[in-house]
Amino acid sequence: MLALDETEINDGAKRWIVSIAKHLNPSSIYVCDGTKEEFDDLASAMVKDGEMIKLNEKNFKNSYLYRSNATDVARTEERTFISARDKSFVGPLNNFLPLDRVKQVWNQFFKGAYTGKTMFVIPYALSSPESKFADFGIEVTDSKYVVLNLHYITRMGKGVIEKIGDRFIKGVHATGNLDPGNKFIIHMPWEKPEGVDADILSVNTNYGGNALLSKKCHALRIASVRAREEGWLAEHMLLLEVKDPQGKSHFITGAFPSASGKTNLAMISPPKDYRDAGWSTRLISDDISWIKIVDGKFMATNPENGFFAVVPGTNYNTNKNAMATLSKNTIFTNVGLTMSGDPWWEGLDPVYDELYDWKGNKRKIGGEPIAHPNSRYTSPLTNYPYLSDLYEDPEGVPVSAILFGGRRATLIPLVFEAFNWNHGVFLGATMGVERTAASEGKVGDLRRDPMAMRPFCGYNINEYFRHWIEIGERSKNKPKIFYVNWFRRRADGTFIWPGFAENFRVLEWIIYRTSHNDNAVETPIGYIPESLNLAGLNISEEDVKELFRIDKEGWKEEMNEIQKYFSELGNVPEEILKEFELEKKRLGY
């Protein structure tokens, strides 16, 4: 760590830090340098103070367990706000906070919030600092946990300090007293109230998505506004490189709401017969992709530098690459702890002795989960065993397919292809998913999550749809758009499709369709495969038919629900309404 007067940080940034410190009133200010020594010192201090637990070094090298407050365990959408002078900027899906209320929050909860504490200053870059995608930010925080997480998920510290100019995103986080009723995560992508010089404010929370301001707050909510203004896309999407047996790389992005298979797909390894035939995969991003249009092509990159991913359900059968990733240099949040000092979560082999649950209670497995359903692991990208050589390419990689997908037990086929760009935008805009533990609310409820951006779009969702339409209008080489659903169930509740590595069979068809017009059957909702490679897969012909069955009556009901949803949104672009009417007509409705 560096004292502020020891750094070579931009004078404008230094002045901002000093002015913020006057309001927060810390006892000291340290600028984070991003070194291993800094990480180790902070981690050791947290362990000494009982704020973190060092895990079994033999099995989980340089890894730790952090337990959050029991009321601070997930993104809190009802306490997440967009502020503007005009409510219409924010739109129907975001929570609006007037500018004068922001000023009240600033004075009530941030004034003196760091009294007696150290103010950590974290300079970070989203995307490689040398990249055309690069965007810079500074987060100030009183939380060592936040500093350690940003060590892993961003490029931060010394290598970034000298590159920060006059334009950077200003984030201020204060742990506060963790009062859920006074939790605020506020974004100001346009104007700010007088005396509040910040783009993002977060208070009375220390949970990842609420406190790691580089992630959803900057890389999606703030960046999505900037992307609209500058003509690019900031998306809640994985980015995967698939290399075919001829050695050609294909790049696929995919938007999936939390717990809908996004991380598992990003980390997919082909089944053995595919590997033997010469197929391979490499990860670029598991969560966020920035896409710029260059010479009519969609060029994508991962703005982040690490993983902050849900861990329950992860094991060597479901995701061996994730297990390799989290075996070292990892911060676990809200998992269980065995008596031997190993982390434990549902999905791992049972432990029959007593262990500690995520709240620190010693007990045996049974009843309430040992690990919180939204427990997480934070690891650097370089932990991943099959990281693409192009993950830091300053030009980005060319996208050939965009996937939309959600967790649906019925109706939605395993895979289908949109008829055209606008139809694909309609499909993404109307994605319906079953609610997960990653956001607060009743698990299992169905809600619309357009492009998996419902919690993350920083402006009016109808303008966001319009932006997608306009991007398509000015792009010569648009990727094809596909919709996938790994979660269709039989009447007895069991999954029809085996999922996980077998999802690669669907990717093979998608890649084929990006450059061919055959092996597809037209249906009222899009093109489905005429045939998939199912060799060696234990699945009945009846199950395959069910995976692709188009239930017209069910779809008519779906269209009624979409109609209600559009009415709630209000000013939906005409192009999407046109696709809606065409879909109804194809369904004979």
UniProtKB/Swiss-Prot annotation:
The gene for this chain is pckG
Catalytic reactions on record: oxaloacetate + GTP = phosphoenolpyruvate + GDP + CO2
Q: Which cofactor does it need?
A: Mn(2+)
* Organism name: Thermoplasma volcanium (strain ATCC 51530 / DSM 4299 / JCM 9571 / NBRC 15438 / GSS1)
Q: What is its main location?
A: cytoplasm
Name under which the protein is recorded: Phosphoenolpyruvate carboxykinase [GTP]
Query: According to its UniProt record, where is this protein located?
Result: Cytoplasm
What GO terms are given for molecular function? GTP binding; manganese ion binding; phosphoenolpyruvate carboxykinase (GTP) activity
Q: What's the family?
A: Belongs to the phosphoenolpyruvate carboxykinase [GTP] family.
Which sites are catalytic? Answer: 260
Which positions in this protein are listed as binding GTP? 259-264, 376, 407, 500-503
Q: Which PANTHER family match?
A: PHOSPHOENOLPYRUVATE CARBOXYKINASE, PHOSPHOENOLPYRUVATE CARBOXYKINASE [GTP]-RELATED
Query: Which EC class is the enzyme in?
Result: lyase
Q: Keyword Metal-binding: yes or no? A: yes
> Which cellular component appears as one GO term in the record?
cytosol
**Could you tell me which pathway this protein works in?**
Carbohydrate biosynthesis; gluconeogenesis
Biological process GO annotation list? cellular response to glucose stimulus; gluconeogenesis; glycerol biosynthetic process from pyruvate; oxaloacetate metabolic process; propionate catabolic process; response to lipid; response to starvation
